[in-house]
Design a protein with these regions (language model features):
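Catalytic domains of cell-wall/extracellular-matrix polysaccharide-remodeling enzymes
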Residues: 39, 84-182, 186-204, 208-209, ...
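Active-site beta->alpha N-cap acidic-glycine motif
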Residues: 2-113, 202, 209, 218
Length: 224
C-alpha cells in the first residue's frame, strides 16, 4: 500500500479549515527590515509560523531580507522609499518605486516578489492620481496587490501597548473567516514585536490555520 500521505496544497488546507469552522489567518508585517526583524524572525521560528513581509529598500539590513527568504517566509514589496509624495507623484515615479525594489530584492535573494502592498493601502488618500493608474502598472507586471482586513493599529504616530495591539488583532480575527492582519516591523514598533508571541499563542489556542501569502492566496482589497 502507498503509505506516502500527499501534502495538501494551501488552498486545500484552507478549504478544509473553513469547512471545520476554523479561522484562516495571514500575519503580515510592513516597513521592514529593521533592527527588530531578526528578533521577529526568531519568534516566528519558535512557533513554527510563516509570515509575509512587505519590505522597503533598507540596504543596512540586507542580511535580514535574505533571512526572510531562507527561513521560508514570503518576501513582498511595499515600495522603495515609502515616501508618499514620490510613490504617488506620477505613473513614472510609481513604476520606479516598484522596479527599483523588485530588481534590488531579486538580486539580493534570487527570488522575484509577486506581491505588493500600497503604502497606506489601496484606499489611501495621499494620491493625486486615481489608484487604478498604479494598479494598471502592477497588472502589467503580473504583480498582485494585497490590502488587509484586520489592523493591529500599530501604524499611527502613537505607540500602542502590547495589550492594545493584541486586542485589536484578536478581536478583528474573531469576526472573520479569513484575516489578513496588518502589523509593522520597524524599530520603533517594539510593542508589535512583543505582542507577536501572545497573538500567535492565542491563534493557536483558537486552532487557527496561520499561513504566508502565496501566489494562490486570494487577495484582500479595500473597496476602491
Amino acid at each position: 500500500t502507498d503509505s506516502v500521505v500527499k501534502e495538501l496544497s494551501d488552498s486545500e488546507k484552507i478549504d478544509k479549515a473553513l469547512a471545520e469552522g476554523r479561522k484562516v489567518v495571514y500575519l503580515t508585517y510592513d516597513d521592514g527590515p529593521s533592527a527588530n526583524t531578526e528578533k521577529l524572525l526568531d519568534v516566528l521560528d519558535q512557533y513554527g509560523i510563516k509570515a509575509t513581509f512587505f519590505v522597503i529598500k533598507t540596504p543596512e539590513y540586507d542580511e535580514y531580507v535574505k533571512e526572510i527568504v531562507t527561513r521560508g517566509h514570503t518576501l513582498a514589496m511595499h515600495s522603495t522609499t515609502h515616501d508618499y509624495r514620490h510613490v504617488y507623484e506620477s505613473y513614472d515615479s510609481f513604476k520606479e518605486e516598484v522596479d527599483v525594489l523588485s530588481n534590488y530584492l531579486t538580486e539580493l535573494t534570487g527570488f522575484t516578489p509577486f506581491a505588493f502592498r500600497f503604502p497606506g493601502g489601496s484606499s489611501n488618500q495621499q494620491t493625486t492620481l486615481p489608484i487604478q493608474t498604479f494598479i494598471k502598472y502592477l497588472d502589467e507586471k503580473n504583480i498582485v496587490y494585497y490590502d488587509w482586513n484586520v489592523s493591529s493599529g500599530d501604524g499611527g504616530s502613537k505607540e500602542l501597548t502590547v495589550d492594545e495591539i493584541y486586542n485589536n488583532v484578536i478581536s478583528g480575527v474573531e469576526g472573520k473567516d479569513i484575516s489578513v492582519v496588518l502589523m509593522h516591523d520597524s524599530e520603533y514598533r517594539e510593542t508589535t514585536l512583543q505582542a507577536t508571541p501572545r497573538i500567535i499563542e492565542k491563534l493557536q489556542e483558537m486552532d487557527a490555520l496561520i499561513l504566508p501569502i502565496t501566489e494562490d492566496t486570494v487577495p484582500v482589497h479595500h473597496n476602491i
